[in-house]
């Protein structure tokens, strides 16, 4: 599966409900972070530390990233 194939329903099934949500798919404002344009961001805190970040633009997933406890960030392969 690629990030572009990930839907909101599949993300909830795979990762659960996010711990934090910033923006929403209907928000007309777009932001850019880590080279990704988005208007909704889901943040999951990981048990081993760090977090998983899922970026959405409208209903399209724009990328999934994993932040390590040391703050380094890598795109997650789905």
Predicted regions, residues:
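Residues within mature, well-folded domains
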Residues: 1-78
């Amino acid at each position: 599966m690629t990030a572009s194939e990930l839907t909101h329903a599949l993300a909830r099934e795979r990762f659960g409900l996010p711990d934090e949500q910033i923006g929403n798919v209907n928000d007309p404002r777009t932001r850019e972070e880590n080279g990704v344009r988005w208007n909704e961001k889901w943040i999951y805190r990981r048990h081993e530390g760090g977090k998983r970040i899922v970026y959405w633009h409208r209903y399209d997933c724009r990328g999934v990233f994993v932040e390590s406890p040391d703050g380094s960030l890598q795109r997650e392969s789905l």
